[in-house]
From Swiss-Prot:
Species this protein is from: Bacillus subtilis (strain 168)
Entry keywords, A to Z: Coiled coil
This protein's name: Uncharacterized protein YxkF
GO molecular function, one term: DNA-binding transcription factor activity
Domain of life: Bacteria
Coiled coil spans: 128-156
InterPro entries named in the record: CdaR-like_regulators, PucR_C-HTH_dom, PucR_C-HTH_sf
Record Gene3D superfamilies: PucR C-terminal helix-turn-helix domain
Any one Gene Ontology BP term: positive regulation of DNA-templated transcription
rRNA-binding in keyword set: no
């Protein structure tokens, strides 16, 4: 983006779709940013070059092809529109990227037959989008997304990658959660290109290795706020449980709690956070979040 700003000094870079009269707008997937360039500063040949690595973005065209529900979500995510009023339950985003001869109708129908609950597909680009789903007991798991990916590949001859996000409270912060998960998904595609369905737990070890210290601390602090908020006792409980190799009996004894009481707390944490701390990858993620939260007190 810096190099483009140097070439086109009248340009504006923003996190939201920015449509200005007399300007062309493009979206940079790698940085998750929009750039609006004055038409007076760019030639037709340069437009073609930019279109080879940036996605043309036009709010009118984007919205005219979408359903009312999809329009509401697109507006909320990219133009600071209001959160759709019907959203009352915790909500998650399942990000996807299609490859091959893409047929949106076929993809939508396949997802509709597979998905056990109601959802909205929001197309962000020609080959990318997000499935918006409210929380229910029938929510698709990682393995089920992998099964769907295999069906699409065998029956429709195009492949897909998924990033299964976590469930969040239905408020304005959903916009921020979407952007953060989209960045995780782009990172996952570079680091785990052959994996059809990924989660935050799966990419976290790679983030540990490749993310700058300050950015990693910020990332972990944000996750800690989501998981624990001001519940320091819950954080201590989860940390001790992991340190005791997920042994409920031993952890309960050290905390002077009844085993069933501790088991209930752990199960509720897993349900609320979407992180299975009984698994190795889930425990690793939660433990580092606990350590960061502890050190920042």
């Amino acid at each position: 983006m810096k190099s483009l700003l140097a070439i086109y000094p009248g340009s504006i870079v923003s996190e939201e779709l920015c449509i200005r009269e007399g300007c062309l707008c493009f979206f940079d997937e790698s940085n998750q940013r929009y750039i609006s360039i004055p038409k007076t500063e760019i030639s037709e040949k340069e437009v073609l070059v930019l279109q080879s690595f940036l996605t043309p973005a036009d709010e009118g065209n984007q919205l005219s092809m979408k359903s009312p529900e999809e329009n509401k979500w697109f507006s909320f995510l990219f133009s600071r529109g209001e959160l759709p009023a019907y959203i009352k339950k915790r909500t998650r985003f399942v990000h996807f990227h299609l490859f091959g001869k893409i047929e949106r109708t076929s993809f939508t129908e396949a997802v509709r037959h597979f998905w056990p609950v109601s959802f909205v597909i929001v197309w962000i680009h020609e080959d990318r989008g997000v499935i918006v789903e409210q929380e229910s007991e029938a929510a698709a798991e990682k393995d089920e997304l992998e099964s769907l990916a295999k069906v699409l590949e065998s029956d429709f001859y195009f492949s897909v990658r998924f990033y299964a996000g976590r469930f969040y409270e239905p408020d304005e912060c959903l916009r921020k959660h979407y952007a953060r998960e989209q960045a995780y998904f782009l990172f996952a595609e570079k680091r785990l290109p052959q994996v059809q369905s990924v989660t935050f737990e799966m990419i976290f070890p790679f983030l540990l290795l490749e993310t700058e210290k300050e950015k990693l601390e910020t990332l972990l602090s944000e996750e800690a706020e989501l998981l624990f908020g001001s519940e320091s006792e819950l954080r201590k409980t989860i940390k001790l449980f992991i340190e005791n190799n997920s042994n409920v009996t031993l952890t309960a004894k050290k905390l002077h709690l009844h085993r069933n009481s501790l088991q209930y707390r752990i199960d509720k944490f897993i349900e609320r956070s979407g992180i299975d701390i009984k698994s190795y990858k889930g425990a690793l993620l939660a433990y580092f979040i606990c350590l960061q939260n502890e050190s920042s007190e």
